[in-house]
Amino acid sequence: MKKHLIYTGMFLAAIGFSACNEDFKDWADPQSNPQEESAGQLTATFTAGKDASIVMDAATADSVEIAKLSSTTAEEGSKIAVNSLTLNENHTIPFSMTEDHVFKVALAQLDSVTQEAYKSRASVVRELKISINASAVTPSGEGIQLVGNEVSITLQPATTPAVDPDGYYIVGDFTGWDGNSAQQMKKDALDENLYILEAEIESTSNFKIFPASAINGNDIDWTKALGSSVDGDDSGDNFVSWTNAGAINTALDGKIKISFDAFNYRFTVKDNSAPTELYMTGSAYNWGTPAGDPNAWKALVPVNGTKGTFWGIFYFAANDQVKFAPQANWGNDFGFVDAISQESKDLAGLSDEGGNLKVGIAGWYLVYVSVIGDDKVIEFEKPNVYLMGDTSYNGWDAQLVEQDLFTVPGTADGEFVSPAFLKDGAVRICVNPKAVSAGDWWKTEFIIFDGQIAYRGNGGDQAAVQGKTGQKVYLNFGNGTGRIE
């Protein structure tokens, strides 16, 4: 059986002006009673309006016609009402409907919603999928929901300023408002359109972004300023404006990271503080009691030269719960975070247990954690440990290959065991979290000294430890010991 809606008297009264009202109204919250059974499903067919391909650089009208009701199976004489118009599933927009059922929207609002939907001001043709929530009231007064099709149109935002080949600078309270004090932003290594400035400031500050072409010695061409459409914008994440640009406010002090995306024309301001140490405690470690005890707070290893990132190999029993902290005590601690990949959740059965990170599947895991400001990432991966270098499967010609993997024990007190060395030479061992490139394996390497696992962490090259053909490495991550024999 199909469904229809029976509307209240208040909704019926509204229909008299909804079909022909030219004012821009936002009817995103229709009033209705619960649906009841109906003998048939009524439909509405919509088509794109005459303004189905909008280019903002060429547009001159204040409003545009984006859709039209072309037909309906509602009873003849029914009055049609539209309750909401939604773009790309999540964005409602004010609209008007003419007497011949043409839907009009303000062009400026449509442009703004398009940019918000794609989080971008880039002058790229964007598809907008329009869903129209429509109803019919029959001559007998019955209100029935209409099922309609989706309509697609396109909009291309206005052209943004060209990327300055010489980059961008920050000028503001914490630099000084002159050209000589401007601080250059660094181009991101992976995104040629992303520019970054890391700074440490004493108090919240206003700033603007300038292309290099705007700075000539101590002089600044203020007409080229980039900022926010709202002066003093402290949102931390918004679009960049190039006309009448207002100042952006950091809303933070201390270590901050300012980013400017010169393609999408967005900025971010983030807390850039990061711990130099990280510890894990939990149900298997007496929940951090006593403070400072290495058996209650398990230290993770820094990823060499990589701010705020750590790793460790740990055994978890089923349903163990853990938290992390930047010291071997409570304070600024965290457990389950949103930035855990589905792959990690599936591998280890990870879940949120009252804010704690719960591990549902017992076993050994390589745990990778990144903490920079409020941005926290936790990943659980297979505990792959590799033999590297002279003694490995094919020396330096084959790295991080299956033939160099250590075996993984099935118990918490078991040993990881390497393949037998194929020749004499310096022994090198590493893990390789997915966030660390294969070529940077040395950032997560370690060796054995005097029967103990010695992690490189943020240190330099470790002293060479020699191995002989046929020997193996034995590692006990549970108690931190190891041997070569």
From Swiss-Prot:
UniProt entry tagged with the keyword Transmembrane: no
Region annotated Carbohydrate binding module (CBM) 3, chain positions: 384-485
Effect upon mutating K208A: Abolished binding to starch
Spans annotated as Carbohydrate binding module (CBM) 1: 161-274
Similarity section: Belongs to the SusF family.
GO biological process: starch catabolic process; starch metabolic process
Keyword presence, rRNA-binding: no
Binding residues annotated for D-glucose, in chain numbering: D173, N206, F207, K208, D231
Coiled-coil parts of chain: none
Listed result of changing R456A: Abolished binding to starch
Signal peptide: 1-19
Protein name: Outer membrane protein SusF
Consequence of substituting W287A: Abolished binding to starch
